[in-house]
């Protein structure tokens, strides 16, 4: 658990929460409610999140020094060919990790070994997002 928490380090004084209000028959989400909770993230928040207990946990990647160690491209396009995206990432040897999101889209992560300026992370992810064909995707950090 500690390695996972360290990997997704971010803002210490607040985090996001999401409740899924409706789901399709196949379990993908239709509608949810998200908000920011102004309290530190605890190990219980992480454990509940990993066990699928709502609310889902949303780590804010920008820390108190305006730095981050990870960022994410949030692709909300559905009927994605996830394997095609993974092959593109691998073919170009991009330092990215992709996973399917709850809604059937994709979360494409970039991790760094040291904290970098949040603006640099965002700029790089916006460029990568456009290169991958998802120029309109939401990018974190914001």
For every predicted segment, state its role.
Residues 73-76, 80-100:
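Active-site-adjacent loop/helix surface patches within enzyme catalytic domains
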Residues 1-70, 79-85:
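DNA replication initiation on ssDNA origins
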Residues 82-91, 111-137:
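Helical (often loop-to-helix) elements that flank the catalytic cores of nucleotide-handling enzymes
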Residues 73, 95-121:
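Histidine-centered divalent-metal-coordination microenvironment in nucleic-acid enzymes
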Residues 53-54, 66-68, 91-93, 102-105:
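Short, well-ordered loop/turn elements at secondary-structure boundaries
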Residues 13-19, 94-98, 135-137:
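Short secondary-structure junctions
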């Amino acid at each position: 658990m500690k390695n996972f928490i360290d990997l997704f380090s971010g803002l210490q004084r607040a985090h996001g929460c999401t409740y899924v209000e409706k789901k399709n028959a196949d379990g993908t989400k239709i509608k949810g409610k998200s908000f920011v909770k102004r309290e530190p993230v605890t190990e219980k928040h992480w454990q509940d999140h990993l066990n699928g207990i709502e609310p889902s946990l949303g780590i804010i990647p920008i820390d108190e020094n305006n730095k981050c160690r990870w960022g994410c491209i949030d692709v909300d396009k559905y009927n994605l060919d996830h394997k095609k995206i993974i092959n593109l990432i691998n073919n170009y040897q991009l330092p990215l990790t992709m996973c399917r999101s709850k809604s059937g889209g994709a979360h494409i992560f970039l991790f760094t070994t040291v904290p970098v300026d949040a603006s640099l992370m965002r700029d790089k992810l916006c460029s990568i997002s456009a290169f991958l064909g998802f120029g309109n995707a939401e990018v974190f950090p914001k």
